[in-house]
């Protein structure tokens, strides 16, 4: 495929997205504390990138060094390019923090007190805090034959201490390790009376660098440097051998913290021989070491915007709106009976989704509730409603995806709580993550004097997660449409039972019909273009990687189909290549909210088919997951999806990045009229 149809590298594309995220921190139009937050988000994203993608690339090099990446590069060459770009990104990130953001914060009365700047009063306070709050929790480990180098946990904060002298047993002291327990605060507020700033903070590393000698009495501390090791965090569960997925997963979770090392981060001033020791102990090479000018974990600074009460330095708060069709209806069921309802988060509130489930839990007419859960958070009113429904005697069935990466433990806990109150809990289909977002409610109603069962459905592009519903852009559809409800019913039956492939009327479902329907729809546009008819494809998603879909889009471009792709993250397709993809544009929207909806638009000879989905156009979504795409039929709602989900992004000239044919992105510059998709929707919907 890559020989005939050129593809771009996935890992480089992911780093490119994080470069666009980091660019938000350099934008003076972004409030200052939000700029700090974007620096932290970049660090969090890079952590996952190393835990998953770089770990996988290293494994491939070890297991099959002669193999090629999908874009045709040798694994080692790809790895070298990714490392080089990651190093540049990290350097840019720390430079931006220290040369731009921190000085600007200081001007606003927000200051981080380094240990070498403390005056006598600050030093006395810091010593007292260390002795009272930190020292009792810390455990020094002196390295010698009886104390081997400890296996440090994934992404934990550690300090390597170079020592001189002999201890009480006469042993020559050379090196010690101090691991910082996760329970210790990484950022401590200094009293304002001592700080001299309205908001003064001290990092845990500053306490350690100044007072680590208290842990090694009568020895000379030659140096103290922080380091962090990132490990492979993929879980291995043998799907052919397991008899209980939850039990098997519970056994694997502790091992995540102790997987193979992937990356070493050290403070920039760490002596070379210390770095060599850390690399050797971690079985890492020189390329895997990242020397950073400051804290090795910037994610810990994510709490600063929450600790500082400065609304003028943050994004303006907003109140998400409630659609009149819901606000004016006696119940959610009455609102849905009156017609399909489209919710656009975060501009429209997620509360109606919660209310639908909460009302269903209490309504004596509701007999059954079925729900998929991928990510929902540790404190979820939605899960509380499901448990209340089960306690109230409803037939509650929940498909909990236990293998949702980094949410496995949370989902295991929810599954246990649901089972404890009598809900039916299933874990989907082994080998196929259930990523579809579906809720089905069965309610007994009286029509024409006769009792009958009516189904109500909610389908979404994003998770049933109230917190991220205020941070991610997503669409949700509430409907009582008979065909859609019947399709959802059958998908739930397939997930909970055993049966053959389904014949669905309205939904496209992976791993069965979703990919063929996408290809068929693209080919229909190709046929129309070749027949001289108008042809258009607009698709919005998080990632575009699947080779056969990319090949079909290239063919569409060559046939004259106008293709506009709005891909927030990684895109393997090359746009704008003469003779191949000159009719394709790719843009990425990066702003206050994480663009998350998946929208497929096909002109379809003027019929304008619009589908919403939980699926990106990636191999995993199309072939190894359970996903659904659902149509928007009501003309008014269809126009809304096109206008709010697609047109505003195509018109954005402030937060849009245009992809070039070499895979690099160029920020689209505003003309006389500034158009920002997210700000425009906030102004339209929110107060």
UniProtKB/Swiss-Prot annotation:
Residues bound to Mg(2+): 375, 405
**Stored Pfam families:** PP_kinase, PP_kinase_C, PP_kinase_C_1, PP_kinase_N
UniProt EC number: 2.7.4.1
Q: Which residues bind ATP?
A: 45, 472, 568, 596
Q: Which reaction does it catalyse?
A: [phosphate](n) + ATP = [phosphate](n+1) + ADP
GO MF, one example: metal ion binding
Q: Give the coiled coil ranges.
A: none
Quote the InterPro entries the UniProt record gives.
PP_kinase, PP_kinase_C_1, PP_kinase_middle, PP_kinase_middle_dom_sf, PPK_C_dom2, PPK_N_dom, PPK_N_dom_sf
What are the alphabetically sorted keywords of the record?
Answer: ATP-binding, Kinase, Magnesium, Metal-binding, Nucleotide-binding, Phosphoprotein, Transferase
What post-translational changes are documented for it? An intermediate of this reaction is the autophosphorylated ppk in which a phosphate is covalently linked to a histidine residue through a N-P bond.
Q: Which cofactor does it need?
A: Mg(2+)
Query: What's an example Gene Ontology biological process for this entry?
Result: polyphosphate biosynthetic process
Q: GO CC annotations?
A: polyphosphate kinase complex
Q: Where is the active site?
A: 435
* Family stated for the protein in its record: Belongs to the polyphosphate kinase 1 (PPK1) family.
Report the function annotation for this chain: Catalyzes the reversible transfer of the terminal phosphate of ATP to form a long-chain polyphosphate (polyP).
Q: What is this protein called?
A: Polyphosphate kinase
User: From what organism does this protein derive?
Assistant: Burkholderia vietnamiensis (strain G4 / LMG 22486)
Chain's gene name: ppk
